[in-house]
From Swiss-Prot:
The reaction(s) this protein catalyses: ATP + H2O + 4 H(+)(in) = ADP + phosphate + 5 H(+)(out)
Pfam families for the chain: ATP-synt_ab, ATP-synt_ab_C, ATP-synt_ab_N
Keyword ATP-binding: yes
Site (Required for activity): 373
Bilayer topology term: Peripheral membrane protein
Gene name per UniProt: atpA
Molecular function GO terms recorded: ADP binding; ATP binding; proton-transporting ATP synthase activity, rotational mechanism
Function, in words: Produces ATP from ADP in the presence of a proton gradient across the membrane. The alpha chain is a regulatory subunit.
Highest taxon of the lineage: Bacteria
Native species: Aeromonas hydrophila subsp. hydrophila (strain ATCC 7966 / DSM 30187 / BCRC 13018 / CCUG 14551 / JCM 1027 / KCTC 2358 / NCIMB 9240 / NCTC 8049)
Lipoprotein found in the keyword field: no
Enzyme class: translocase
Protein name as annotated: ATP synthase subunit alpha
Residue positions binding ATP: 169-176
CDD domains: ATP-synt_F1_alpha_C (cd18113), ATP-synt_F1_alpha_N (cd18116), F1-ATPase_alpha_CD (cd01132)
């Protein structure tokens, strides 16, 4: 068969018409330096702030410095095997982490990868780690409580859903203990918890996970870990990753609680990255944007209104508000709350729980200093019964602190002063609480009622703890219905007062103290 020139030309035209090539534009650059977890890249045009940059060996870096002729990026993980001259690619994406209910009960790293050996996670999708916080119009005022189960906090420094309450104090004064007790107390409250461990020893984190599991609270909790041995970039990003996981519940009309343990170590990791990127240092060698580092994170903790939830879920959830409550932890050096990072976070949050070494070492645990601890919005969220009964407790402790200072210089005190000092000592003793033993609203109310109505006046100081234990045991066995009623309604009226009075009178009649 012979083809003439016309047929050949037609065939070529057909082939050309059918030929389809897809042009692919790739943003590539070359590594010009590698040192201390920082790479400088030349030729990576159109890079975004915070963009993921793909490195050889399926590793990633985060673009943080965008300069005229180079990009400074921080490597997320190990930088072994990277060298000058290697090619890198821009991905055009910012960092996203998996979110969803399948994360509950799991231990994850900053990137949302499981590290607990329980297999792959079942996530509902991905969320960017940097999200703009809800606006003023989308928020709702805080008016529902988060019960920590700790008398000293729920009575005097109440926390509401959507609040940011700072836990601040020196090392080894029980900051993490308060956070873990709060998580344990949420196992039946419906509040989902996220615990972000930043720069801690792996053994400490393993102990926390074990305690949560023992008390049945791990199934309700996501644990995000950036341990002390991990790269500074992962420690810096861990709180944002945890926050995105918590926002999943907030945006769907549910309540969540997130604990950042602790933000001092995150600030140190960010300072390290900034200095290596040659950004100008400021006070205490922190970069100028260290306030923004924490403010953009903590502003994402909020109570959002029903309209926001309905719009976010495209009408799937109606008439429900969502909340994300944050308990950031800050470690001070020798009680110095006027340092740079502590003052920043105090000004961002809605109050602080201040723990002191002096109280801790004298056996008052939790070592909460009620004089300088404050909750700026929690009062509106306090349960009715605890709010009514706790007012006198705060006053009694304030008067006791004032009188105790004067009593040191005076030996002859009048009866009224002596009674006030005695009452203050007993209330201080009553505020003590063992770790991993949170109390219900009914139990707290009963203890506060006993203190408020003078039932402790004839109980010796060294028997207060035993008195409390016996009282709660008696209430559980003899007055279980009343305890259940208070837990369900938390009302304070004449009928409840009458029942509580009868309970305490019966208890005092059956036992001598």
């Amino acid at each position: 068969m012979q083809l003439n020139s016309t047929e050949i030309a037609e065939l070529i035209k057909q082939r050309i018409a059918q030929f389809d090539i897809k042009s692919e534009a790739r943003n590539e650059g070359t590594i010009v330096s590698v040192s201390d977890g920082i790479i400088r890249i030349h030729g990576l045009a159109d890079a975004m702030q915070g963009e993921m940059i793909e490195l050889p060996g399926n590793r990633y870096a985060l673009a943080l410095n965008l300069e005229r002729d180079s990009v400074g990026a921080v490597i997320m993980g190990s930088y072994d095997g990277l060298s000058e001259g290697m090619k890198v690619k821009g991905t055009g994406r910012i960092l996203e982490v998996p979110v969803g209910r399948g994360l509950l009960g799991r231990v994850l790293n900053t990137l949302g990868q499981p590290i607990d050996g329980k297999g792959p996670i079942d996530n509902d999708g991905f969320s960017p780690i940097e999200v703009i916080a809800p606006g003023v119009i989308e928020r709702k005022s805080v008016d529902q409580p988060v019960q920590t189960g700790l008398k000293a906090i729920d009575a005097m420094i109440p926390i509401g859903r959507g609040q940011r309450e700072l836990i601040i104090g020196d090392r080894q004064v029980g900051k993490t203990a308060i956070a873990i007790d709060t998580i344990i107390n949420q196992k039946d409250s419906g509040i989902k918890c996220v615990y972000v461990a930043i720069g801690q020893k792996a053994s400490t984190i393993a102990n926390v996970v074990r305690k949560l599991e023992e008390h049945g609270a791990l199934a309700n909790t996501i644990v995000v870990v950036a341990s002390a041995s991990e790269a500074a970039a992962l420690q810096y990003l861990a709180p944002y990753a945890g926050c995105s996981m918590g926002e999943y519940f907030r945006d769907r009309g549910e309540d969540a609680l997130i604990i950042y343990d602790d933000l001092s170590k995150q600030a140190v990791a960010y300072r390290q990255i900034s200095l290596l990127l040659r950004r100008p240092p400021g006070r205490e060698a922190y970069p100028g944007d260290v306030f923004y580092l924490h403010s953009r994170l903590l502003e994402r903790a909020a109570r959002v209104n029903a309209e926001y939830v309905e719009k976010f879920t495209n009408g799937a959830v109606k008439g429900q508000t969502g909340s994300l409550t944050a308990l950031p932890i800050i470690e001070t050096q020798a009680g110095d709350v006027s340092a740079f990072v502590p003052t920043n976070v105090i000004s961002i949050t809605d109050g602080q729980i201040f723990l002191t070494s002096q109280l801790f070492n004298s056996g008052i645990r939790p070592a909460v200093d009620p004089g300088i601890s404050v909750s700026r919005v929690g009062g509106a969220a306090q349960t009715k019964i605890v709010k009514k009964l706790s007012g006198g407790i705060r006053t009694a402790l304030a008067q006791y602190r004032e009188l105790a200072a004067f009593a040191q210089f005076s030996s002859d005190l009048d009866d009224a002063t002596r009674k006030q000092l005695d009452h203050g000592q007993k209330v201080t003793e009553l505020m003590k609480q063992k770790q991993y033993s949170p109390l219900s609203v009914a139990h707290q109310s009963l203890v506060l009622f006993a203190a408020e109505k003078g039932y402790l006046s004839d109980v010796e100081l060294n028997k207060i703890v035993d008195f409390e234990a016996a009282l709660l045991s008696y209430a559980n066995t003899q007055h279980a219905e009343l305890m259940a009623e208070i837990n369900a309604k938390a009302d304070y009226n004449d009928a409840i007062v009458g029942k509580l009075t009868a309970l305490l009178d019966d208890f005092k009649a059956t036992q001598t103290w």
